[in-house]
UniProtKB/Swiss-Prot annotation:
The gene is tgt. This is Queuine tRNA-ribosyltransferase. One of its GO terms (molecular function) is metal ion binding. Keywords: Glycosyltransferase, Metal-binding, Queuosine biosynthesis, Transferase, tRNA processing, Zinc. It comes from the Bacteria. Its EC number is 2.4.2.29. It catalyses: 7-aminomethyl-7-carbaguanine + guanosine(34) in tRNA = 7-aminomethyl-7-carbaguanosine(34) in tRNA + guanine. The keyword Transcription does not apply. Homodimer. Within each dimer, one monomer is responsible for RNA recognition and catalysis, while the other monomer binds to the replacement base PreQ1.
Length: 372
């Protein structure tokens, strides 16, 4: 991986990340393709209509079905899906924790039952790296010990202790495998934990950022805390993260969350919100959210967003999308998803331009002004 910090606008950063498969301009939003597919889209949509240079797939889900060994036999993620750009794979720890009826973390890893058939599995730091070697992602995440908030200080301290221990095991194993010729073109990120407690975040960030990772993520946020708590936690944590490596805020979030956290120095984001909300009838626009299922749009000839250049807005009216949604037509899900993801990715491109011109504060003010 080649990382270049090109410009800053106060704490906001414009960077370039070069992997074996693409050049990623930051700030970047990564569409979520949990199962190796961005819901409702094909890879032509992702490439040609969205211009996405990186998408996310999930280790837990790909491990359970179709199986990481199957993916490896089919040409790894790039060959299996035909997406030629970069993949980031989450370690699967969050899904093992949240989707399993029975999930137990110990000092050795996470035991869980499959949400598909109830079979028992055990993720260790080394196993999730082996799985991600089979998947062939450009950026892999380590196994971390996730804590649901609110949590006791004792439990958060244990989470940090385990995450640091697993990180040390992970980076040692990953670099050893690279010397053996396995995963030579892959990169690995660590995940900082600590809830919303600044002392815990300092401890976790300090311990992890001393290790030889290619980038660092902030995990354990957007799990029910107040927005200001999230923003304060991010602002504090980035102070302890290196300036010469990517910074990734996991699972976040709304357009407002992206704007606020770019200002605080975050480079990379992912979230299911634009795709999930599209399917549920909520569309994101330059002027705020639009609930397309509302009767007010039944005879509205305007595009979803007059400032948007996506295929959906160039060709179709709000009335047509309202009709498709109410009729539960499959075409709706594609058109709505194209719009929402285009909005997110374009917002990142505009943010980048503002940073390059050292006008991020003005860009942020205009973003909120349009929302009234």
């Amino acid at each position: 991986m080649e990382f270049t910090l090109e410009a800053t606008s106060k704490n906001a950063r414009a960077c370039t990340i070069k992997t074996a498969h693409s050049t990623i301009k930051t700030p970047v939003f990564m569409p979520v393709g949990t199962l190796g597919s961005v819901k409702a889209l094909d890879m032509e949509d992702v490439l040609d209509l969205l211009g996405a240079e990186i998408i996310l797939a999930n280790t837990y889900h790909m491990y359970l079905r179709p199986g990481d060994e199957t993916v490896a036999k089919m040409g790894k993620l790039h060959g299996f899906t035909t997406y030629p750009k970069s993949f980031l794979t989450d370690s699967g720890g969050f899904q093992a924790f949240s989707l399993s009826d029975i999930s137990k973390a110990s000092e050795n890893g996470i035991e869980f039952r499959s949400h598909i058939d109830g079979s028992k599995h055990f993720f260790t730091p080394k196993k999730v790296i082996d799985i991600q070697h089979n998947l062939g992602s450009d950026i892999m995440m380590i196994l971390d010990d996730l804590v649901a908030l609110p949590a006791t200080g004792e439990r958060i301290a244990l989470s940090i202790e385990r995450t640091t221990a697993w990180a040390k095991e992970s980076i040692e194993y990953f670099r050893k495998k690279q010397k053996e010729g396995i995963g030579a073109e892959q990169n690995i990120f660590a995940i900082i934990q600590g809830g919303t407690d600044k002392a815990f975040r300092t401890k976790s960030a300090t311990e992890l950022c001393a290790l030889d990772f290619d980038g660092f993520a902030i995990g354990g946020l957007s799990v029910g805390e107040l927005n200001n708590e999230m923003y304060d936690t991010v602002e504090h944590t980035v102070k302890y993260m290196p300036k010469d490596k990517p910074r990734y805020l996991m699972g976040v979030g709304t357009p407002e969350d992206l704007i606020e956290n770019i200002e605080r120095g975050i480079d990379m984001f992912d979230c299911v919100m634009p795709t999930r909300n599209a399917r549920n009838g909520t569309l994101f626009t330059s002027f705020g959210r639009l609930n397309i299922k509302g009767a007010t749009y039944k005879e509205d000839a305007q595009p979803v967003d007059s400032e948007c250049e996506c295929l959906t807005c160039k060709r179709y009216s709000r009335a047509y999308l309202n009709h498709l949604f109410r009729s539960r037509e499959i075409a709706y899900f594609r058109l709505a998803t194209i719009h929402n993801l285009h909005y997110y990715l374009n917002l990142m491109r505009e943010a980048r331009e503002a940073i390059l011109e050292d006008k991020y504060a003005e860009f942020k003010a205009e973003f909120y002004r349009k929302r009234g």
